[in-house]
C-alpha cells in the first residue's frame, strides 16, 4: 500500500481525534499583531479559527476564498500558524495579503503549536467554526468549501448578509 493511499485513513483518524462539534474550545492566550492578548473567552464570536502553515500548498490555495468569506460576512477569522518555523515576521508578512484575517502569535504563556495541540490538530489547514458560547459547530480537515463553511457559520448563529 502506497503512502498516498493511507491519506484518507490519516484524515479520518485526525478528525476522530480533534475537538468535536459541541465541545468547548480550549483555553489559550496568544497575541494579536498589536501585542494584545486574545483568549478563548475574549475572542469575538461566532468566529472561524484556522490552523495553517506558510509552506502549506492547500493553505495557499484556500486562503483567498476564506478571505473573501471574511470580507463578505464580517465574521472574525483567527489564523494560527502551527508551524514552529513560522516566526512572527513570516506570519505577519504572509498575512499582508489577507487584512481581514487576525493572526495570533506566541505569547509569554502560549506558543501556537501548544494551542494546536490543545485543539488536537494533526495537519494543515484545519478550520474550526465556533459559536457565541465558544463551542465547536464544525471542523474541516483540509480545504473548507465555501458553501459548507457558510452553512457552518449559520449553525454558529452568524448573522450573514
Please annotate each region the language model reported:
Residues 1-7:
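Bacterial N-terminal signal peptides that target proteins for export
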Residues 7-14:
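Bacterial N-terminal signal peptides
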Residues 14-40, 102-103:
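N-terminal "domain-start" segment that seeds a small globular fold
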Residues 25-26, 46-47, 124-126:
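Short loop/turn microsegments at loop-to-beta-strand junctions
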Residues 39-57:
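Short active-site neighborhood of thiol/selenol oxidoreductases, capturing the structured segment around
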Residues 60-98, 108-115:
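Structural microenvironment flanking redox-active thiols in thiol-disulfide oxidoreductases
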Residues 95-133:
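Short, internal strand/loop/helix patches
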Residues 126-161:
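Thiol-/selenol-based redox modules, centered on thioredoxin-like
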Amino acid at each position: 500500500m502506497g503512502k498516498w493511499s493511507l491519506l484518507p485513513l490519516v484524515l479520518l483518524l485526525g478528525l476522530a481525534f480533534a475537538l468535536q462539534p459541541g465541545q468547548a474550545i480550549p483555553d489559550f492566550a496568544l497575541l494579536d499583531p498589536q501585542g494584545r492578548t486574545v483568549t478563548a473567552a475574549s475572542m469575538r464570536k461566532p468566529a472561524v479559527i484556522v490552523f495553517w502553515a506558510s509552506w502549506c500548498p492547500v493553505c495557499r490555495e484556500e486562503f483567498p476564498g476564506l478571505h473573501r468569506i471574511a470580507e463578505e460576512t464580517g465574521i472574525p477569522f483567527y489564523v494560527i500558524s502551527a508551524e514552529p518555523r513560522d516566526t512572527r515576521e513570516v506570519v505577519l508578512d504572509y498575512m499582508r495579503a489577507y487584512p481581514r484575517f487576525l493572526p495570533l502569535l506566541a505569547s509569554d504563556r502560549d506558543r501556537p503549536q501548544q494551542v494546536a495541540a490543545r485543539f488536537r490538530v494533526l495537519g494543515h489547514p484545519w478550520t474550526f467554526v465556533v459559536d457565541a458560547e465558544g463551542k465547536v459547530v464544525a471542523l474541516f480537515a483540509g480545504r473548507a468549501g465555501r458553501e459548507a463553511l457558510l452553512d457552518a457559520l449559520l449553525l454558529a448563529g452568524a448573522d450573514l448578509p
